[in-house]
Amino acid sequence: MARIAGIDLPRNKRIEIALTYIFGIGRTTAQRILAETGVSADTRTDNLAESEVAKIRDYIDKNLKVEGDLRRDVSMDIKRLMDLGCYRGLRHRKGLPVRGQRTKTNARTRKGPARTVAGKKK
């Protein structure tokens, strides 16, 4: 079983898809990793040689920020915005959409389930 960046990659999937189970690695990044390390994208995870796993692991450690480090950076960026008190930080603090979406209707993902307001009629 291949273990990279603290994640056990699924055995029966192609390595190109299996790498996307790591937070911070999508399809494009996975393809770039495999091209740089010279590993075939069609290889199944359980068919990888230990040397290929080591090459992939080394490349990710040296060149990419993934999993815990990336999650920490994202949360620190959001915390910095909230501490600054800028518009984006205020929207994060209030739990509202940050990027200019409408909130009169929709925005239920950020706002949570609808709460009925007493005495309000359409």
UniProtKB/Swiss-Prot annotation:
Keyword RNA-binding applies: yes
Single biological process term from Gene Ontology: translation
Query: What Gene Ontology terms describe where this protein resides (cellular component)?
Result: cytosol; small ribosomal subunit
GO MF, one annotated term? tRNA binding
Question: Record's InterPro entries?
Answer: Rbsml_uS13_C (IPR027437), Ribosomal_uS13 (IPR001892), Ribosomal_uS13-like_H2TH (IPR010979), Ribosomal_uS13_bac-type (IPR019980), Ribosomal_uS13_CS (IPR018269)
Q: Where is this region: Disordered?
A: 97-122
Does Thylakoid appear among the keywords?
A: no
What keywords would UniProt list here?
A: Ribonucleoprotein, Ribosomal protein, RNA-binding, rRNA-binding, tRNA-binding
Q: Name one Pfam family in it.
A: Ribosomal_S13
The superkingdom of the source organism is: Bacteria
Stated family: Belongs to the universal ribosomal protein uS13 family.
Protein purpose: Located at the top of the head of the 30S subunit, it contacts several helices of the 16S rRNA. In the 70S ribosome it contacts the 23S rRNA (bridge B1a) and protein L5 of the 50S subunit (bridge B1b), connecting the 2 subunits; these bridges are implicated in subunit movement. Contacts the tRNAs in the A and P-sites.
Q: How does it assemble?
A: Part of the 30S ribosomal subunit. Forms a loose heterodimer with protein S19. Forms two bridges to the 50S subunit in the 70S ribosome.
Can you say what this protein is called?
A: Small ribosomal subunit protein uS13
* Species whose genome carries this gene: Geobacter sulfurreducens (strain ATCC 51573 / DSM 12127 / PCA)
Taxonomic lineage of the native organism: Bacteria, Pseudomonadati, Thermodesulfobacteriota, Desulfuromonadia, Geobacterales
Per the record, the gene is rpsM
